[in-house]
């Protein structure tokens, strides 16, 4: 079984449900056994910087090296420092990373 982490920010449930359904459905069509771990922060929803910092701290909880791959979406992240922090973190792991909406050398 392949373990995939999906990291996203600020999406509401209908959009993310479609992503999970698409990833899992596509995996099944390809005959792949995938377990998807979804981490969705909401650091863009508040004017309270401490709240936002706490939300983004959730991204530090998973050991990303324990996954077979990571899907990274920061299209709703408005804090450039947070995007750059996550990019550096993802560049330091030894698994493939697919980046949605943000071009990073070395990511797919």
Language-model segment annotations:
Residues 1-108:
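Alpha-helical recognition/docking segments in bacterial nutrient-uptake
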């Amino acid at each position: 079984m392949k373990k995939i982490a999906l990291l996203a920010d600020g999406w509401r449930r209908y959009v993310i449900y479609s992503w999970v359904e698409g990833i899992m459905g596509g995996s099944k069509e390809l005959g792949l056994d995938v377990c998807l771990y979804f981490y969705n922060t909401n650091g863009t929803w508040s004017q309270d910087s401490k709240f936002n910092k706490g939300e983004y701290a959730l991204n530090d909880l998973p050991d990303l090296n324990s996954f077979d791959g990571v899907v990274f979406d920061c299209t709703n992240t408005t804090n450039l420092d947070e995007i750059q922090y996550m990019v550096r973190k993802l560049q330091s792991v030894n698994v493939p990373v697919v980046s949605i909406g943000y071009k990073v050398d070395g990511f797919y």
